[in-house]
Amino acid sequence: MVKKSEIRLHAFGRACHLIVDNGDGRGIELLHLCQDELKRLENKFSSYLPDSITSRINQSAGTGFYIPVDAEARSLFHYIDALWQESKHIFDPTTRILQDCYSRTGNLLASRDQLHKMLKLVGWRNLERTDTGAHLSGKGMMIDLNSCIRPYALDSVRKLLLKNEVNNAFISMDQEVASIG
């Protein structure tokens, strides 16, 4: 019997590598569960998929329309709140709008006036939430949760493997790594 099972895949635009102990012959099954979990989270939160919660919040920015969110999304937003506060607002998932203002080498492509207008669309505090929904207050605002969702996804896969009584595993998503055993 093969001692380990592994798979390489992409999630959230990053290379992933999963290795699980196959001592009980369930390695392939467990990898499929992990792959399904990553796909579920990507479909739900990726900024680049049009039907995700994130994209729907971005599409409704400035309309006053709240996009329904579940407990998992509220929990992720709470986690991001903590990151935003701990970083003294340096970490801010609403800065994606600024990425086109600069070249890959850091040169400013937008005029100072354009940049000033775009900076008015930045601010995590402008993601307004209720118990059932969320929306961005300003038209043109957008959030990008990909930098937050990768560690969350890594932890989610690790918890899934622990729930399935896996004793040894290695989970890598780009530069984020977790292990069991």
Predicted regions and their residues:
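A conserved glycine-rich
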Residues: S147-V157
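Beta-rich nucleic-acid/ligand-interaction surfaces
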Residues: Q175-G181
